[in-house]
Every structure is written in C-alpha cells, then in structure tokens.
C-alpha cells in the first residue's frame, strides 16, 4: 500500500504517538508512507523566520529501526492566526501534489484543516480517507474564539470520512455523537512492545539518578502540560508531612518545566523532585524500571476527559501500579481491579502512593496492570490497522 498521512503537529519533534508506532511498523512490512505535517511548535524556535520554506526530509525512525518515512512540511507564514490561512493554502497545494504524484491508495488524517482539504480532494479522485482520532481535536485549538469553527469542521470531517478509527471507546462514542456513522467507526487501541522493555536496568538507572534502594519513585513521562497535575504532586512532596523517601521523577518537557525547576531550589528538594528533559524512546524502559509507581494526575478537563494516553499502556506493560485521576476515558478503558488505582484529584496522589507503599500491595497491583494490557501487542494492533486500511481500499 501507498499511504499518505496528513496531520497538524510536528512529526519530527513530537512523539512517538500512535501514528509513529503504526506507520513505522507498516513501513517495516513493505508499505510506503509519506507524511504531510505542520510545525505546531514554531513559536518556540528563537531563530524562526516569518516565512518558513517547504521542507522535504527523510526522518529517522522513533520506534522501529530502519523504518524511514518521508515527511513533507509545506511552506508556512509563521505569524499568529495568519498561520491558519497560510496552512489552508500551502497544505492544499501539497495535498494535491502528493495525490497526483505519489498516488496513495489511502489517506489517513489526524488533524482538522488539512483533513478537511484531504477529504475533499480524495472524494474527487475516489481515494478512501480514514480519520484516526486520539483527541477531541477542536479542544486542542489554543484560541477559544476558533474552537467553535474547528468543531464544525471536525464534525463535517466525521460525516464525510470513509472510516473513523478511535484509540478508545470513549472517543468512539464522541465521534458518533459528532456525526460519524456508527457502522463506519471502529476502535483500534494503543499497543505495547514487551521486547522494548526486556533489557531495562533498574539498579543502574536508580544509581545514575541518585535514588536509594528504599525510595518510592512516582514516575511521569510526556509533555508537562499545565493541567498535567504535576505541580500539585510536587507541592505535596514538598510538604513537611510527606515521607522523604517519596520522590517524583518526571521525564519530558513543557509548560511546567520551569515551575518544577523553581520547586527544586527549595531546601532539600533537588533530590526529591527529579526532572529529566526529553529522552530518546529507546531509553524510556530504564526510567520505567527505576520507578515504583506510575502516575497520571491530570485534571478532568475537556481535553483529557475522553482520552487514554499511550503512556498508560506503557506504564502497565512495565508491571507498575498506576495512580490516575478519575478521567472518564481511562476509567471506561481499564475499569477497576486491573492495575489502575483512582483518586479524585492530583492532590490525592502522594497520599495514595504512601498508602500503597505501606500496605504492601504495589507488586500485586503491578501484576494486574501488566496482565490487563498483554493482549495489546503492537504487532497484533498493526495487523488490525493494516487489515482495516485494506478493507476500505477494497470497498472503493
């Protein structure tokens, strides 16, 4: 198959997300994949120019060695709000170019605006379009003024797609509520790779990070969003009544990076709040192994309500108990008694971690977590995705 992916995030700087895991595995199976992306993080580049030229690059793989993917980043005017108008023009030209020259068998979309363009162009060429949903997309638009418009476009995209895939049941219900025909919706979940976890070295990583044998490490990885709940967890660790053996290990970057660094400057906190910048995917198993409890203390806002982050599956595959806030999507996905312990708010995480460490239940809960996700093998999930693409192509 020839597969064209259209998305509105940075394929190179972000992830690995669901798209990286699936597309790199498809490339390793002999399929050809091209990605049209958008540098959503352009504001963070101090050397940015107003006009960013078109780029075409062969990107190094994030998860599967040798699975190189061609990424095309259309030219864009890097000015607030103007970026959207610029995207409409440059992405339309690029999508038409790729449809006419690359001639994909199927197009897979992860965004809003360029998905709308792709759907229209695919329809005129009788090419199937598959929408893959890992978020309530319009919620991610940073300008509240535009979220209503984005929602309308997103709704239209669901109605016109040949197949709508969701990463969990909560998001499938959301897409149906937004106009997707139920018979055209399916759930293809995130996966796990047990081989990825095989050679993790707990003792070595704990020694590198200055973690003692009896320390209890709460682990978070990913983007440090303001609503991630990490600020509240760190504050509770700082409190005098929190046992000194309770430590927070955060791997990633984002809005809370600087506030966490400030908290570390408080007396005695530098070795209890451990922050590590973005790390290569291959190194993450060591950090997972070094931890004792994994956490998802996110606030129950509109962005987080129905999603299940990939990190949840990776936490659980590592055999770690997970403390999570009561996010409806997560609770619907994993239920109770399956390795996830729920708390009402981020402020309850440290107390619950102390409770688990004292009652001796961590190992048992970790075993249940691993058992819960064992069937989510990435190869099996890729089989399902590959078959779904083949079926939608055959129908056309």
What are these regions (language model features)?
Residues 212-237, 249, 366:
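Conserved donor-binding/catalytic core segment of Leloir-type glycosyltransferases
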Residues 293-296, 314-324:
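Short hydrophobic beta-strand element within catalytic cores of glycosyltransferases
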Residues 336-347, 355-360:
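Conserved acidic donor-binding segment of nucleotide-sugar-dependent glycosyltransferases
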Residues 361-375, 387:
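A short, well-ordered alpha-helix in the C-terminal region of glycosyltransferases
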